[in-house]
Amino acid sequence: MNMDWKNLIINIPDYPKAGINFKDITPLLANGAGFKAAIEEMAMICERQNAIPDVLACPEARGFIFAAALAHRLGIGFIPLRKPHKLPREVAHINYGLEYGEDCLEVHKQDIKKGMRIMMVDDVLATGGTMHACMNLLQSLGAEIIGAMFLLELTALKGREKLGTAAVYSLIQD
């Protein structure tokens, strides 16, 4: 597809704090043709790579938008990884370090089956810390991670390196 993705993402300097160059994806979401094209391109990547998973999984929050739409397009399920105390059934969790602290994600244990083929999805790949933690959590429950897909990859932060041997796909590299 010949979509000029970068024109649909706005750089916001010094947000949410000084020194951070925030990538605002909401203009892409607000553009019907752009959003549809992004989902179609993600689906085509899965189809071309023969990488149709059993389900998609995604950490909250903005990635949910892409993962849910892509799961619908592919006709498969979507498993959310949530912040603590958001899921009502028995959960497995993982604590992981961030640049300035620690965070935790949870998933319903019974939703993950041994050998389940999962494609991870998120809006942005930055340092890779959150996605690495998600992948470790799901693998600890017996899932097979077949890859990770992102709308935007911030290549200078080298997040791809943190994801090990997983196939990494991104529509935009910046």
UniProtKB/Swiss-Prot annotation:
Q: Provide the primary localization.
A: cytoplasm
| Pfam families, sorted | Pribosyltran (PF00156)
Subcellular localization(s) per the UniProt record: Cytoplasm
EC number(s) recorded for this UniProt protein: 2.4.2.7
- Top-rank taxon: Bacteria
Q: Which cysteines are joined by disulfide bonds?
A: none
Q: What is this protein called?
A: Adenine phosphoribosyltransferase
Organism expressing this protein natively: Dichelobacter nodosus (strain VCS1703A)
What is this protein's gene name? apt
